[in-house]
């Protein structure tokens, strides 16, 4: 079954909606941006979630000690890095680590470096200069058809209820990650969250 991660959680109601709909993982963004959440707020939400839900902290080129402090304070189960973090950087954490890579015509060659990373999963997102993620745009899935990864792949980048089944059929990823695609007017939409998870579960 494909793992489903809903990213950009900022409130308890949205977290509960996602969990009740069957989400496997929830993402909490600690990097600058409109979905950024304060560690104390994330901690309060996470403490009310079932233990089987994987809670993922999203960071961009953050100081390792700051990451470790937030992870311990919030009780995060995994860390997702969206910046220029090195393999050595990723090796320094006890939590599961997800390393994000941007996919675009000019960046596919860089994906070969992914094998150097001692991480739990690779996350493939749409490449956008100057933006670490959350673009809401789909990349051409054919760009990664010839690539073989030894680690599980989580697919991101412009996924939504209308294309998640096609994405899973084309890429056959370990998991799918969505944020913008389940929003309306910049806010998480409960109906879209439920639809996305249902369709992802029915894929393949």
From Swiss-Prot:
The keyword Cytoplasm does not apply. It is an enzyme of class 5 (isomerase). InterPro entries: Aldolase_TIM, PRAI_dom, RibuloseP-bd_barrel, TrpF_fam. The keyword Isomerase applies. Keywords: Amino-acid biosynthesis, Aromatic amino acid biosynthesis, Isomerase, Tryptophan biosynthesis. It comes from the Bacteria. One of its GO terms (biological process) is L-tryptophan biosynthetic process. Pfam families: PRAI. GO terms for molecular function: phosphoribosylanthranilate isomerase activity. PANTHER family: N-(5'-PHOSPHORIBOSYL)ANTHRANILATE ISOMERASE. Belongs to the TrpF family. This is N-(5'-phosphoribosyl)anthranilate isomerase. It comes from Desulforudis audaxviator (strain MP104C). The gene is trpF.
